[in-house]
From Swiss-Prot:
Upper lineage: Bacteria, Bacillati, Bacillota, Bacilli, Bacillales
Gene expressing this chain: gatB
Protein name: Aspartyl/glutamyl-tRNA(Asn/Gln) amidotransferase subunit B
Organism expressing this protein natively: Staphylococcus aureus (strain Mu50 / ATCC 700699)
Enzyme Commission number(s) from the entry: 6.3.5.-
Alphabetized UniProt keyword annotations: ATP-binding, Ligase, Nucleotide-binding, Protein biosynthesis
Subunit and interaction comment: Heterotrimer of A, B and C subunits.
Family, per entry: Belongs to the GatB/GatE family. GatB subfamily.
Gene3D superfamilies xrefs: 1.10.10.410, GatB domain, N-terminal subdomain
SMART domains: GatB_Yqey
InterPro entries: Asn/Gln-tRNA_amidoTrfase_suB/E (IPR017959), Asn/Gln-tRNA_Trfase_suB/E_cat (IPR006075), Asn/Gln_amidotransferase (IPR018027), Asn/Gln_tRNA_amidoTrase-B-like (IPR003789), GatB (IPR004413), GatB_C_1 (IPR042114), GatB_Yqey_C_2 (IPR023168), Gln-tRNA_amidoTrfase_suB_CS (IPR017958)
């Protein structure tokens, strides 16, 4: 029997507001534990919540960017549960009247475009954070009350690979809107995954398992891959899948049972009595709509249709707003479009990955990168020299030409000097000369390599090719 995988994702996004959802406390990451709190966050008796209008605007902006319908009337509800980092013993969320419904995003997997539906987007407050140490636990309520939006996909995802693509696209769109940093490492983006299997052709969904502790997109994919295999083996062996919440163990790559899954009835939702419903008229919706910036799909189309970039380049460059903005600024400084794209996808990304830094944390600027690319364009600097210059440019900033000169990397373009390298290579590699004369094209490449090696990569490659052909034709 063959099974179809059905996946739905619940993504929590922390909104980048100055204050919390229902209190004036700061909502900033990284403060001393329990320093960003007040009587509302600590649930003192008699205190009343006040809705953060900026958070509502940003929830609407995100929903619009995800092609959602904005509710005319939306309300808050109490989700009741007890946990030490939830001092009220309930969370203010939205149950049956979310702010946004019926959206979608388009993803690309293996060269094909697929539309993934989004059921709803609702607002809620975050809980605090518990840290467990041995026999005791520490509670930090700085995060308590931070504004969140939860984005719930339709069960349209059919593979862990599609889930990864959905998360990448969702993160990209939200980042472009400016409503969140969407940094998983800081907790401003978190994901729970629901997965079930059903026989191909069956309409009824199988029993789902919810996966938690998915701290990176890669872990989401790995957790789903493991769970897909676990459920298939269980079903093929005649077993049944229970409705469970499971935790992904990063060290083993397996999912581990946490508890039997609760349903919404277990939370005893009821309308929040201390907050009146939101009435969102067309004028309010239009004001928010006017604030939506250019989104990744629009930029991607512009890069292909107006700048002439391949679709792959456009996709990679628009994955993050940071990279896309940097690209646009670099070409505004006069750098060649395709060379800039190649450097950002190649040398720049390699440097960032190797040093585990973000682009904006380096000393690289669009201006100094454009300066280096223009030196490559006009033949002053070879690509090989550029690779030696770039790490210092990214680490210390400055001017690429000056770095090249300070490190004795100036490209050799003097013909007399280059002829010495050329003739030395020909004298030392007579067999390659014969191979060239016999029509073996690889011989030319080998000889160029020998010359570049002898000149320590400083020979002007265009001039080397010209002089080498000239000298070969004489022999």
């Amino acid at each position: 029997m063959h099974f179809e995988t059905v996946i739905g994702l619940e993504v929590h996004v922390e909104l980048k507001t100055d204050s919390k959802m229902f209190s004036p406390s700061p909502a900033h990451f990284g403060a001393e534990p329990n320093s960003n709190t007040n009587v509302i966050d600590l649930a003192y008796p008699g205190v009343l919540p006040v809705v953060n209008k900026r958070a509502v605007d940003w929830a609407m902006r995100a929903a619009m960017a995800l092609n959602m319908e904005i509710a005319t009337e939306s309300k808050f509800d109490r989700k009741n549960y007890f946990y030490p980092d939830n001092p009220k013993a309930y969370q203010i969320s939205q149950f049956d009247q979310p702010i946004g419904e019926n959206g979608y995003i388009d993803i690309e997997v293996d060269g094909e475009t697929k539309r993934i539906g989004i059921t709803r987007l609702h607002m809620e407050e975050d809980a605090g954070k518990s840290t467990h140490k041995g026999e005791y636990s520490l509670v930090d309520l700085n995060r308590q009350g931070t504004p969140l939006i939860e984005i719930v996909s339709e069960p349209d995802i059919r593979s862990p690979k599609e889930a990864y693509a959905y998360l990448e696209k969702l993160r990209s769109i939200i980042q472009y809107t400016g409503v969140s940093d969407v940094k998983m490492e800081e907790g401003s983006l978190r994901c729970d995954a629901n997965i079930s299997l059903r026989p191909y052709g069956q309409e009824k969904f199988g029993t789902k398992a919810e996966l938690k502790n998915l701290n990176s997109f890669n872990y989401v994919r790995k957790g789903l891959e493991y769970e897909e295999k676990r459920q298939e083996e269980e079903l093929l062996n005649g077993g049944e899948i229970g409705q469970e919440t499971r935790r992904f163990d990063e060290s083993t790559g397996k999912t581990i049972l946490m508890r039997v899954k609760e349903g919404s009835d277990d939370y005893r939702y009821f309308p929040e009595p201390d907050i009146v419903p939101l009435y969102i008229d067309d004028a309010w919706k239009e004001r928010v709509r006017q604030t939506i910036p250019e989104l990744p799909d629009e930029r991607k189309a512009k890069y292909v249709n107006e700048l002439g970039l391949p679709a792959y380049d456009a996709h990679v460059l628009t994955l993050t707003k940071e990279m896309s903005d940097f690209f646009e600024s670099t070409i505004e400084h006069g750098a060649d479009v395709k060379l800039t794209s190649n450097w950002l996808m190649g040398g720049v990304n390699e440097y960032l990955n190797k040093n585990q830094v973000e682009l904006l944390d380096t000393k690289l600027t669009p201006e100094n990168l454009a300066g280096m690319i223009k030196l490559i364009e006009d033949g002053t600097m070879s690509s090989k020299i550029a690779k030696k210059v770039f790490p210092e440019l990214a680490a210390k900033g400055g001017n690429a030409k000056q770095i090249m000169e300070d490190n004795g990397l100036v490209q050799i373009s003097d013909e007399a000097t280059l002829l010495k390298f050329v003739n030395e290579a020909l004298d030392n590699n007579e067999q390659s000369v014969e191979d060239y004369k016999n029509g073996k094209g690889k011989a030319m490449g080998f000889l160029v390599g020998q010359i570049m090696k002898a000149s320590k990569g400083q020979a002007n490659p265009q001039l080397v090719n010209q002089l080498l052909k000239q000298e070969l034709d004489k022999r």
